[in-house]
Amino acid sequence: MKIIGIGDLVLDIYMNESEIKGITGGMSFANVIYNITRLLENYNSSYNNNEGEKIDFETIIYGVCGNDISGDIIIKELESGNINTSYITRKDNKKTREFYMYLDENDNFLTSKKKNYITKKESWYGSSLLKGDIPEELLSKENIYVFREC
């Protein structure tokens, strides 16, 4: 079984008014794929000697991001989670979307925005960079698809 996430990739940046506190790959569809992978790997590892109980699966992201450091971070995180990233397109001269989670002085969540407090810049584009048809080898009735509205 293949579980495929489809959409534009986003880097989530956690920060307060003066510094970045953490970064991680974001966007709901990618988070779902990442968590499904972890859950199924944990499930399979609980059946060490009983191959018949294991679930045969592959998780894949079919998506797009900029050819920049934010895209590098996201892809590295996905690959470290054993997710197939070979269907991610890197766009030159495009910045990967970034979403900012603002924290108070105690690191409690305040709000989220598309604009960076510090630089006052926004790295968000209106329409999806994901263009074209889904590759035929990813199309099957047996697959599960997780979409991001583009």
Language-model features, listed with the residues they occupy:
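A general structural signal for well-ordered alpha-helical segments in protein cores
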Residues: I3, F29-I33, G71
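Positively charged, low-complexity intrinsically disordered leader regions
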Residues: M1-K21
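Gly/Ser/Thr-rich beta-alpha loop segments that engage phosphate groups in nucleotides
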Residues: L9, M27-S28, C65-D68
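Short catalytic helix/loop segments, enriched in acidic residues and glycine
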Residues: E19-R38
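Conserved N-terminal subdomain of the carbohydrate kinase-like
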Residues: I13-E19, L40-F147
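Active-site beta-loop-alpha junctions enriched in small/polar residues
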Residues: C150
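Generic helix-packing signal
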Residues: L9, T37-L40
